[in-house]
């Protein structure tokens, strides 16, 4: 549905795609200025920690238990009421379908009760715009979306307009961080714990595989690194050895991300004017210091500006969902109340159709 809105917009965002129950109220001014009025996140770390990862059934039940209170707290903290909302933006996928259904159903209920439009947001589109929560970033830009479930390079030319340049052919970078951290006996979530352990380690001590060296595309692969590091971890007996392996893994992931970004920048430069050379990194792995340093070096080398979300908005949050919804609503784009939850939902669906070998799994289109 379309019905352009040029005035200020007050949007409630809801995020329940994995193990964070989050709600946020964001104001988007008519000139595009964004203000986060509240951001409330309910974590489920303690529920999933004994299992070393997210258990979908536990996550969905936890969302059901907490979504009411968290949304109410976000509205209260913003100093507004539900009746003041101009729209509701809820993650509709991709993600764990049980959790996605909880947030989307709650969003539909609020929208229906208040007579407000609903925007069913692609979780990845939320990450794509998340850097705009901390800075005014114009379109177009080159985006590295890197998290526990996703690893993609995208050319973003406008709201919802994404062209995929590269994607992982197996595991995501964040998954590699988490699984290797688990093999090292580190607590969940593993990525931040591995980064902490890596401080002072020797990244050259262990020989770790480098993926897809013979290819000149922008795709990623982390399964070989994950397997090799897990095997080495089984043999380690000292803290120094564990520290060195953590440093090596972090360096290997940062190097591969940097190499593919460098390739993508060269492709992007061929079709864009110098004033449009903007690079954005988003997703949970964007909080890793070694990764940021490697990507900053790519930007300096290729003449790109660098932007990343504030650290609070790197991992899953509802402010980015509210912003993505506000951007769509400002263009008059919103959804019917029969919008469905989509566990698989590519940002660039054309690329998914053009390359089904990389884009489809047993459960449908990959993210």
Curated annotation (Swiss-Prot):
This is tRNA N6-adenosine threonylcarbamoyltransferase. Its cofactor is Fe(2+). One of its GO terms (cellular component) is cytoplasm. Keywords: Acyltransferase, Cytoplasm, Iron, Metal-binding, Transferase, tRNA processing. HAMAP family: TsaD. NCBIfam families: gcp_kae1, T6A_TsaD_YgjD. InterPro entries: ATPase_NBD (IPR043129), Gcp-like_dom (IPR000905), KAE1/TsaD (IPR017861), TsaD (IPR022450). Required for the formation of a threonylcarbamoyl group on adenosine at position 37 (t(6)A37) in tRNAs that read codons beginning with adenine. Is involved in the transfer of the threonylcarbamoyl moiety of threonylcarbamoyl-AMP (TC-AMP) to the N6 group of A37, together with TsaE and TsaB. TsaD likely plays a direct catalytic role in this reaction. Its main location: cytoplasm. Binds 1 Fe(2+) ion per subunit. One of its GO terms (molecular function) is N(6)-L-threonylcarbamoyladenine synthase activity. Substrate binds at residues 145-149, 178, 191, 288. It is found in: Cytoplasm. Belongs to the KAE1 / TsaD family.
